[in-house]
Amino acid sequence: MGKGASVASVKVGKTGFETRKNIPGNIKEIKPSLLMSVPALAKNFRKNIEKNISAKGPVIEKLFNHALKLSYSYNKEGINKGKGLQILKKPLLFLYDKILFSKIREGFGGKIDFFIGGGALLDIELQRFFYAIGMPMFQGYGLTEAAPIISGNALERHKLGSSGFLVQNLELKICDENGNKLPVGKKGEIIVKGDNVMVGYWKNEEATKSTLKNGWLYTGDMGYMDHDGFLYVLGRFKSLLISDDGEKYSPEGIEEAFTDQSPYIDQCMLYNNQNPYTVVLIVPDKEAINRKLKEENQ
């Protein structure tokens, strides 16, 4: 923990906690170079950005969407940014950044180098959006039991959609339900070993034995390693849904896709217990629906 830091905000003997509505103003005032965020807050940032762009009229909105599309194709997954003929798009992207994206960044203080996303799986579409406007949002992975960083992306080496590359002096393997090591690209439980892994749970020998085996920490998370050395975390290994043909899949990514693709869905939850079909419980975004109905009735 030689490079770690702990920061607390204390005022008049009390710990301060900000409300969400004040966060945008605080960011603009402080002008941070690094911002740590959870996906829910980042999604709220994106909604506000798109809302402000839409309010400027159809011409600006169309120009912004074209700039996003161009930036997406240029950036790709980050690791292959601007490769080959994509480099020809750079002059136009520079112009778009000057007249559009830089103005958005000013709303965040104008100095942010990148976001760090944590607390939950970060949707790749959200990463592409912030990457396009010049404020990359990188995902990492860690556990308290691993003190806590296991992997992370960095400005000089990153791949959108991944949880990054492993920290130094850490071993990782992907295993099946029986503890057998799987090859690169195969999905299984993420298991790690290294000096940063805990000795055990305080006064809980039973939990320690089930989590630590021969020095290996069984995280309970499902994922895989790709051929470029990046880790992909897919969800909790024990929360997998099972269809009637025995296929197992993680619900988190599908649930994220539902809420990301429709502005009228607030939350959703998938369920399947060895049935031939999967059901989903959807909670509508009443405010968004009412707003759309008012627009249609005008």
What is the predicted role of each segment?
Residues A40, A120-L121, N196, E287:
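Alpha-helix/helix-capping structural signal
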Residues A5, S33-M36, K47-H158, P263:
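Gly/Ser/Thr-rich phosphate-binding loop
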Residues G194, V199-G200, M222-Q298:
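AMP-binding/adenylate-forming catalytic core of the ANL superfamily
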Residues I112, V167-L170, I265:
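Core-facing hydrophobic residues within beta-strands of well-ordered domains
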Residues A8-V10, F115-G117, I242-S243:
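Short catalytic-loop micro-motif centered on adjacent basic/acidic residues
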Residues A5-E29, P58-V59, Y249-I254:
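ATP-dependent adenylate-forming carboxylate-activation enzymes
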Residues L166, K173-C175, N180-G185, I191-S243:
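Conserved ATP-binding/catalytic segment of the ANL
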Residues G13-N52:
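P-loop NTPase motor core
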